[in-house]
Amino acid sequence: MESYGRKRAWKKGPTRGKGGPQNAACEYRGVRQRTWGKWVAEIREPNKRTRLWLGSFATAEEAALAYDEAARRLYGPDAFLNLPHLRAASAAAAHQRLRWLPASAAAAAARGGAAAVPAYGLLNLNAQHNVHVIHQRLQELKNSSSSPTKPPPRTPTRANPPPPPLPTSSPCSTVTNSVGSAALPPPMSCFQALEQAMAATAAMESAPCDDDAAVVGFGADKPQLDLKEFLQQIGVLKADDDGATGKNGAVHGDDGELADAFGFGGSGEFDWDALAADMSDIAGGHGGALGANGGFQMDDLHEVEQFGGCMPIPIWDI
């Protein structure tokens, strides 16, 4: 029973190896450090296992003073204190809380008007470090607003001119933009060029073609000849008053032997095989050979000069 009345031995509050970097070196009771550097204070109620939160502080000494004040209220004059010699300093700091109040509220409190003092003036500012910082910042802003300073004059800065546009190129067309050049059409992509070409081709195919008009790009400067006129020019067929040429190139005459001799059958159609056989016979009689394309191959230039006036020109070479 005698040991029951004794005071408990001094024990360090925060757990070793946890909390902030200075938590293990702290010797204050009920004070521990967070991992991000803040100091907090807690105290256990008498005969209970619950703990009371005292607040967060910037330094370990402020947290220790908060614990000492709570211990005096809960345990009386026999409570364990972290900083017993700083009790007078903490009491003096309590009188300095009025400096955070407005001037009108402080004057009313000095005259005895307790009702004019706002409720936030009774807060424990020492236990709330963030409130200290807020009040200091508000005071600095108030002082700066009362004496405004002129901002330094801005020097005009010349903006750099934009770089000249780079030449744009595409797989189908290349357009170079230069200063002072005439307005050029926008570049055309490959797909647009292909669509325009297909549209032009479709328009040409859909347009009605004239039999007498020459096809553009193919034989435009060569006149269209009839088969009879062609044979007469090369000397194979002589002009005959009795014969006539129809629209489809068929030879009609009184004498059918002349038509059969030059490859025209009874139906009026030209027989190319018969013409090739006749040309082979002519070539064999004159000592020439028929080439691969139906042309004559002469042995020397004298034969070319001799038969040049009457030799037929192969129509496959035209």
UniProtKB/Swiss-Prot annotation:
InterPro entries: AP2/ERF_dom, AP2/ERF_dom_sf, DNA-bd_dom_sf
PROSITE patterns: AP2_ERF
Any single biological process term in GO: positive regulation of DNA-templated transcription
Molecular function (Gene Ontology), one example: transcription cis-regulatory region binding
Top-level taxon of origin: Eukaryota
Biased composition, class Pro residues, residue ranges: 149-168
One annotated Gene Ontology cellular component of this protein: nucleus
DNA-binding region: 27-84
Residue ranges, compositional bias (Basic residues): 1-15
Record-annotated disulphide pairs: none
Induction: Not induced by high-salt and drought stresses.
Compartmental location: Nucleus
DNA-binding among keywords: yes
Family, per entry: Belongs to the AP2/ERF transcription factor family. ERF subfamily.
Protein known as: Dehydration-responsive element-binding protein 2E
Organism the protein comes from: Oryza sativa subsp. japonica
